[in-house]
Amino acid sequence: MDYIQHFSAGSKHVSKKSVAVDAEARKLVENAAVNYVTKHYKGIGYTVTSREKENVGWDLDAEKSGICLKLEVKGLAGNTISVRISQNEYKSMVNNKDCYRLCVVTNALCNPSLIIFVWDDEQSAWVSDIDQSIKISIEEKPSYLAVVE
């Protein structure tokens, strides 16, 4: 939180230090989320492989009994679900609906909770795997914004 001191109220200038701290904080949240999702899927018998550095449109492969899931992991520091999806991730979601999972970890750094969104053909929407009344809308922009409706 030290970076807050470097931002002047009313100023539109954000110091390089605050940007660096924000990037570091985002990386911590993302790493915690990836670790949480990996642990979750391993706990239910999947073999999990990182694809993060390959730029394939998802972060992890999860394989079990001939099933291969493509897991895109989004970590959030709080519990409001609103995540950025890159064009590459969105293209992968659309092209792999049957095996793609959008795994959102809220409160990733303390008391994490996992919500997994899967494609539902009947609703033509991405819905929570445990409560299909929870669905996300995806707003197209240079990157995509997915928000719980």
Where are the regions that the model predicts?
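Domain-level recognition of nuclease-like catalytic cores that cleave nucleotide substrates
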Residues: 105-149
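Acidic-basic catalytic patches of nuclease active cores, encompassing PD-(D/E)XK
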Residues: 16-49
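Catalytic cores of nucleic-acid endonucleases
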Residues: 44, 73-124
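Residues that act as N-cap/strand-start positions at coil-to-secondary-structure junctions
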Residues: 42, 54-56, 86
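Conserved catalytic cores of phosphodiester-cleaving nucleases, focusing on short active-site segments
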Residues: 41, 60-62, 68-75
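Short coil/turn segments at beta-strand junctions that form active-site/ligand-binding loops
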Residues: 46, 67-68
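Interdomain/boundary linker segments immediately adjacent to catalytic/signaling cores
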Residues: 1-23
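Beta-rich nucleic-acid/ligand-interaction surfaces
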Residues: 51-64
